[in-house]
């Protein structure tokens, strides 16, 4: 018994068109600060911070730090009972860094995973700030920016993290997610200690970010 042969392509036999990846729409600034950045009047985040201006557009960060990378750190499901039954939402955590002294972390929640990630991505970009790199290890004392300049401590929820200077070539002595955040910030060598509920990604990420921002507030 012969079987009908399937024809390649779609239902009408025509070849399927390959979907091209969507190109990101060009940034059109909406704020006065964004317009100045887009016009080239402001060329660094330091200028914005010194002026005490508030960044409200992620496009500003992308324009000033074109080498910035964003990575999804964690995606989870939030379920709770409501009067209409069980409600399900997604929670995403995204990190943004250029592996050379800048890091930001954001969180987003939505009914769709994609939208939750987009919200977290945008928030991570808006939270990007400078990290002071250096060599604070008494075992090394070189002049390269491969570690932190001194011991720093940060807290997020129940999680407390310390980052200590390490000699060049040691690497990052840290757990997987903490290590990746340090890499995105630009650290190559460091000791770390962590206390509390470190599997809680949101608290751990906040603790790491606060830790690294101490490099400026203490310096």
Curated annotation (Swiss-Prot):
Biological process per Gene Ontology, one example term: translation
UniProt superkingdom: Archaea
Keyword Repressor assigned: no
Coiled coil residues, start to end: none
Keyword Acyltransferase listed: no
GO cellular component term of the entry, any: cytosolic small ribosomal subunit
All copies of domain S5 DRBM, residue ranges: 68-131
Keywords: Ribonucleoprotein, Ribosomal protein, RNA-binding, rRNA-binding
GO MF, any single term: structural constituent of ribosome
SUPFAM superfamilies: dsRNA-binding domain-like, Ribosomal protein S5 domain 2-like
PROSITE patterns: RIBOSOMAL_S5 (PS00585), S5_DSRBD (PS50881)
Disordered: annotated span: 1-32
Function (record text): With S4 and S12 plays an important role in translational accuracy.
Recorded family membership: Belongs to the universal ribosomal protein uS5 family.
Note on domains (UniProt): The N-terminal domain interacts with the head of the 30S subunit; the C-terminal domain interacts with the body and contacts protein S4. The interaction surface between S4 and S5 is involved in control of translational fidelity.
Subunit field text: Part of the 30S ribosomal subunit. Contacts protein S4.
Name the record gives this protein: Small ribosomal subunit protein uS5
Lineage, opening ranks: Archaea, Nitrososphaerota, Candidatus Cenarchaeales, Candidatus Cenarchaeaceae, Candidatus Cenarchaeum
